[in-house]
Amino acid sequence: ALKRQDKMHLKEAAALLGVSEMTIRRDLQGNDAPVTLLGGYIVLEPRGVAVSRYLLSDEQTRLVEEKRHAAALAASLARPHQTLFFDCGTTTPWIIDALDDALPFTGICYSLNTFLALQEKPHCRVILCGGEFHASNAIFKPLNFQETLRNLCPDIAFFSAAGVHPRYGATCFNLDELPVKHWALEMAQRHVIVADHSKFGQVRPACMGPLEAFDTLATDRMPDEAFIAWAQAANVSVMW
């Protein structure tokens, strides 16, 4: 079935095979087959591409409840009829999941798993920014910012980060993500970074920007006193 349509919803696959959704999730995690689970869909990975398992497998099943907690806090900031930008990563789909299905909004994204999550929201107008596809983190890197992104000013930008550090700022693993992240920092009216506790104190290779550039940080537990003191001095609100 996947050879015909490239993707299939998890529920549809479970019904087709006569097994539970949990069984399929478990089998995909322990299988080297050229398929992966993104936003509730089983997706064929691109042929001829050596895909990193960081986004697609390892991180997707790591600290899930912590990510969901932080994501729900971030989702509470959204209001009807706003334009919302969603970063790539494995935390941002949980933000979308936490949004009320009755909420009307416009969702901007540039990653496949985030797009698949947004299309499940019945009152969401989805804008997927196209470009060169990078299978390692499932993003579309824009070839021309003037085509779409420069025409958009989100009310809120929700960012994910692999590292959160008062001195070195918010960081991630992939340099290819930076152009869109930097656009969102420049054009969005409010900047919200969503990161579970394991990201604090970490520094990754690609710098998104200083933490002072973000208005709000949503996480799953109270940071240490030194970080809270820094956040108060920097006028960054922290939710946990």
Label for each model-derived stretch:
Residues T90-P93:
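Gly/Ser/Thr-rich loops at beta-strand to alpha-helix junctions
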Residues V64-K67, I108, A138, F173-N174:
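A conditional alpha-helix N-cap/helix-loop micro-motif detector
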Residues D87-C88, D196:
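Short His-Asn-centered micro-motif
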